[in-house]
C-alpha cells in the first residue's frame, strides 16, 4: 500500500547534504528524509550524481537503508561503522515492517517479517526465538521478505515473497542511479520541483488528472545551492511531465530540500486522493 495507491519514487542529488559538514547534521537531515518517505509511503529513493558533489551517494544510501532496516536486523546487516555513529540515535521509523519480537505461540501463518539468510543458506533470522526455515537455498546475508507458512514452538516455516504483494506499506528501497536521474519505467509521471517552474496553482487541475491515471510517479528535487535546470540541463521541461514551483510566494531565499520533499509528498497525496472533491 503506497501513497494514494500510487508507486512513488523520489530522486535526490548526492549534493543534498552540501550545507552540512558534520556527520551528525548530515545524519539528522537524512533521518528527516527517511521519516517523510515513511509517512507518505514512498517506494523508492533514487540518488543521482551532481558533478559538483563530494561523492556522498554511498554514505546517503547506507544511512537511508540503515534507518529502513528493522532494528532486530541491523547488527547482522551493518557492521560497526563510524559513518553510522549517529544513525542509531535517531527515532525509529516504526513502519509495519519494523515488527517487535513475538512469542512463537502467537505467530500466525500469513504474517510477514523481514529477515536475513543465515550461513547455512536455508534458514532466516526474522527476529524470532528460532530461525525461519526457508525450504530452499539462498545467498547468506541476503535480506528477504518472508511470509510465514506454518509455526509451532519447535519450527517455523516461511517463503520469500515480493514486498509488493504485502497489503500494507513495507518500506522504501534505495538505489544509486548509474545513469540518468530520470530512468525508471515503474515511475513514468515525472514531476520536477524548481523555483523556475510553473506555480503549482497554474497546473494543479491538469496535474490532478494525470496523477489519477498514473501508476507510478517520480518526484525530482535539487540541492540547496542550485536547481534542477542547472544539474539536468536547460531542456529539463522536455525530459519531464511537469516542472512546478511549490513555493511561488516563499518568503525565504531558498526552501530547504527536506521542506520541498515534505510539501511535494503531501500535495501529491492530496491530489491523488479519491476523497478530494472535484475542483470547480
Name these PLM-found stretches.
Residues 1-280:
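Post-transcriptional modification and biogenesis factors for structured RNAs
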Amino acid at each position: 500500500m503506497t501513497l494514494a495507491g500510487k508507486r512513488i519514487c523520489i530522486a535526490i542529488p548526492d549534493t543534498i547534504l552540501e550545507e552540512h559538514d558534520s556527520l551528525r547534521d548530515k545524519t539528522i537531515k537524512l533521518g528527516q528524509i527517511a521519516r517523510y518517505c515513511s509517512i507518505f509511503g514512498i517506494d523508492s529513493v533514487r540518488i543521482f550524481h551532481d558533478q559538483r558533489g563530494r561523492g556522498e551517494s554511498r554514505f546517503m544510501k547506507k544511512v537511508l537503508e540503515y534507518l529502513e532496516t528493522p532494528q532486530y536486523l541491523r547488527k547482522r546487516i551493518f557492521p560497526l561503522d563510524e559513518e553510522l555513529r549517529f544513525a542509531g540515535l535517531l527515532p525509529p521509523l516504526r513502519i509495519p515492517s519494523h515488527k517487535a519480537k513475538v512469542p512463537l505461540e502467537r505467530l500466525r501463518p500469513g504474517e510477514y517479517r523481514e529477515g536475513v539468510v543465515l550461513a547455512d543458506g536455508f534458514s532466516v533470522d526474522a527476529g524470532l526465538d528460532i530461525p525461519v526455515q526457508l525450504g530452499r537455498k539462498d545467498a547468506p546475508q541476503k535480506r528477504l521478505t518472508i511470509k510465514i507458512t506454518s509455526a509451532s514452538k519447535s519450527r517455523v516455516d516461511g517463503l520469500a515473497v515480493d514486498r509488493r504483494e504485502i497489503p500494507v506499506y513495507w518500506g522504501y528501497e534505495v538505489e544509486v542511479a548509474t545513469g540518468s536521474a530520470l530512468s525508471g519505467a515503474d515511475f513514468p509521471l515525472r514531476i520536477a520541483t524548481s523555483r523556475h517552474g510553473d506555480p503549482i496553482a497554474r497546473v494543479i487541475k491538469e496535474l490532478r488528472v494525470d496523477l489519477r491515471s498514473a501508476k507510478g510517479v517520480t518526484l525530482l528535487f535539487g540541492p540547496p545551492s542550485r536547481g534542477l535546470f542547472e544539474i539536468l540541463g536547460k531542456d529539463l521541461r522536455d525530459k519531464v511531465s511537469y516542472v512546478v514551483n511549490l513555493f511561488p510566494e516563499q518568503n525565504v531565499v531558498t526552501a530547504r530540500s527536506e521542506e520541498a520533499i515534505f510539501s511535494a509528498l503531501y500535495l501529491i497525496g492530496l491530489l491523488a486522493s479519491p476523497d478530494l472533491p472535484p475542483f470547480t
